Amino acid sequence: MTRTLAEILLFTSLAINAALLLFLASVLRMVMNDMNESEFKQFVVSLVHHSKKSPFMLTVLNIPFLGAIPYFYFYRFANRWLLAGLTLWLVAGALGKTMKLRIYRAVEIGDATRLKQARRKLNAGNMIQAILNSLAVVLALVPFVR
């Protein structure tokens, strides 16, 4: 595999991640906002449960990390833009996970008041992660357009 092909594949995986998170932060956010508290709670618990077991989600969300390991082993850190994009993607994922895991736990045990707060925090967390992932894609795109 050539270095360019490896970079294209890593870029594509970052773009798919960003697209998935933009969908969650925009379309799914509106769907969740249309739900009452009990529907929201049931939906989020079900979504998290099925996402953790989905081969598609596990694959799509982990390909950039798994692909970066052999890329950096073979090609080192020559492409600093790709490195910056992957680093931002990793930071966004870690931030998103730490923010949202607490929210998911609060949703599971939450009353109506806490669910409203959890919904706002979840919306904000998804939006922040989607924006950061989109910026990661832009960073990784720079070498292809120069």
Residue map of PLM features:
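Short amphipathic, positively biased membrane-proximal segments
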Residues: 1, 31-34, 127-134, 139-140
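Interfacial loop at the N-terminal end of multi-pass membrane proteins
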Residues: 3-62, 108-120
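Hydrophobic residues within membrane-embedded alpha-helical segments of Major Facilitator Superfamily
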Residues: 9, 13-16, 88, 95-96, ...
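Core segments of transmembrane alpha-helices
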Residues: 57-70, 129-138
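Juxtamembrane helix-break-helix junctions at the cytosolic face
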Residues: 68-80
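Short alpha-helical packing/oligomerization segments
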Residues: 77-102
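Interfacial loop-to-transmembrane junctions
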Residues: 102-132
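Juxtamembrane boundary at the C-terminal end of a transmembrane helix
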Residues: 140-146
